[in-house]
């Protein structure tokens, strides 16, 4: 049988760590994977990974499926369109329904993660009727629950990771800059500060880079792979970001600043001066807090067998085997499709005339 071809679609740097476990499973099965990376996203491929640099190359590659951890996927790419999500449904803002559950008409398959997402998407599947939902677990979870990732850090001094979200009105970075600088100077802790690629405020970035430059115990990390940071840290300071949950997968505590949905799994504070005492409590790993963390993470991601990527590929096989039986037609989405073509400069008819 001829090897299957799969396309991995990247719009932002966080996609690499989500898609690489899937790529490993594809290769393990004897099939092939290639990457298409949007023009404004940094290329961070590893040796041996295949990079399709043009839209024409991606279309001609003719994959059986395309995987996207973002909100959209080019409809003109061949193959089954698979949504993998860029995180978990944690509700960053105060809202009735998280935008995690927004259906935009791009995807054929939604690969859900667990009880926090599957029931909602099953209801949307019934409501819309043009896609199928499979609970597979998140491919990135294969990395989190591997034995090597679960190893506890051995730091001489406690390490605090600070990865604030970019979301307006939720981001803690403007409010905590002075307090973090004070704690860096007065507490026996090491700090790692890293920002989401969408957090682009130049004053905020410059302020935290200055703190790192002036304090030997502070690192400002810039790069797409946050996993080594999560592994190294003993505790996290954050606000309302899905990276909180990912850190908790490693059985580690989190202090949040004005979290939009606080609960017993978090140590949430509402004033900057409370951050230091909260971090001290987190570093002591109270038994009740750690028990709540384990229950919370299981609600979001019960799949701990490192086979989420395998289930994603099995879902694609099942979708193809069943065909479109019982499915409605996708919406035309003409305006969205036109905007996407304009954004990606995809005009195949013009290409034909130019030949």
What are these regions (language model features)?
Residues 7-147:
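Active-site and donor-binding regions of nucleotide-sugar-utilizing enzymes
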Residues 71-72, 77-85, 223-266:
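A donor-sugar binding/catalytic signature common to diverse glycosyltransferases
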Residues 104, 129-130, 210, 242-304:
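Catalytic binding pocket for nucleotide-activated donors in carbohydrate/polymer assembly enzymes
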Residues 32-42, 46, 187-222:
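Catalytic donor nucleotide-activated moiety binding site of glycosyltransferases and closely related
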Residues 15-27, 139-209, 304, 308-310:
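Conserved catalytic-core segment of nucleotide-activated headgroup transferases in glycan assembly
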Residues 53-60, 201-248:
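Donor nucleotide-activated moiety binding/catalytic core segment of transferases
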Residues 283-355:
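C-terminal amphipathic helix plus adjacent low-complexity
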Residues 45-56, 78-86, 210-219, 252, ...:
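Active-site regions of enzymes building and remodeling cell-envelope glycoconjugates
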